[in-house]
Amino acid sequence: MTPQTSSTGNAPKGNTQVAYPIPKPIIWLGRLLQFFSKDLAAAYSRFFFMRPMRHKMKPAESRWKQEAEQQFIEVPSIGKTISVYRWGPKDAPKVLIAHGWSGRGTQFIDLSRKLLDAGYQVYAFDAPAHGQSGTKSTLMLEFIESIREMDRRFGPFEAIVGHSMGGIAALNAVGRFGLRPKRLVTVGIPDSIKKIFYQFAEIMGLKPVIAKKNIDYLAKVYGTDIDHLAGSYNAALTDIPVLVIHDKKDKEVPYTEAEAIVRNLKNGKLLLTEGFGHRRILRNPEVIEQIVHYIRTGKLLNEDHGTQE
């Protein structure tokens, strides 16, 4: 099927947010280790690869968190506990929001409020090693399992909205594991998971062989070929409607990865923005309006007005 594509936004030009920097002493030690033991260098880099950054919560997010009904649930498949948040009337249709790496379930204030205004209740969670969910390290697998457990406990969901790691995890949950929300919306998600390992090794100043060792190690942990985590692979297994949103100025994940994912979707739409980057896109009113409209109708706003590109 030919994906349907649209575009929105003319944000001011400027630098978008980039990946969180790694302190130079950590990089220097990793570079040194690889000359003595590639296995040790791989384990060393993996230690940091699996540890998200934690950030202080701003007052607006803190107030939004206080408005939530909060509970902690166990995810038996990974043996960890996650913090769950809920807003809105309990008899309303449900939307699940999945945050990205180093994010929190309480960060989607504007989107959540618009969903509440549209008559939905909103569920979100802090993935392992994020927010209030405890532990210090995590993997994409644990994002996937957290989403599956949310569906088992609180589903079915009208839609799942996932940003970055949360989005690719949601696509895996739908594609490989058969979750059936009515619709899925992804924002700024990667296609190739292998590429992330090589990019991280490059940031650390490590040789590609170190990335390969980590890929092989984590393939054993996941119990699957890492290629089977890819966005395009799971897109081919997905038959529910999916809206893929990506910014052309995203410096962390190039928008060409979104295009690759959409090409494999049976029922996919691509919405490209320009100038919002990897994170500010989540606060853009036009994008939020498109997400809510898509969840309600399965269409983009410009489709209703006959201006689809």
For each of these PLM feature ranges, what is it?
Residues 276-288:
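Catalytic histidine-centered segment of alpha/beta-hydrolase-like enzymes
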